[in-house]
Amino acid sequence: MSTHIQRSALLPYPARALFDLVNDVKRYPEFLPWCSASQVLEESESLMRAELTVAKGSLSQRFTTRNVLVPGASIEMNLENGPFTELHGVWQFKALGEKACKITLDLTFDYAGPLVKATLGPLFTQAANTMVDAFCQRAKQLYG
């Protein structure tokens, strides 16, 4: 059975700045405690393929997503490979004037079997639940 998580936040920063922050996959290990490594495999104005490694203690798992980009507006993530049967997410960035934005993360995922769910489940669920907060804190660090 799939897990669905939706989180949002209102921030005093432009939509494009927040889009750029979320799309800066290479820097994830700097501020996402569960992300031990990240690599951009392919990148263009409208597409990114990225590999993330999630880790806690001795447990680590890698997964690759194909992200469709609408600069300043949305990032749609779809699983290419990894320990999931399903992983689909959408970040949306809705401008509220010139210097404010509502960000929303809508994420659906399911694990590839009970062993993966038992080992990776708690870590990934916690990561998904705290992801918007982590990006809000990062925005405050970078943009004041």
Curated annotation (Swiss-Prot):
The entry's protein name is: Ribosome association toxin RatA
Q: Which UniProt keywords apply?
A: Toxin-antitoxin system
GO MF, any single term: ubiquinone binding
Taxonomy, superkingdom: Bacteria
The record's similarity note reads: Belongs to the ribosome association toxin RatA family.
Transmembrane regions listed in the UniProt entry: none
Do you know which Pfam families this protein is assigned to? Polyketide_cyc (PF03364)
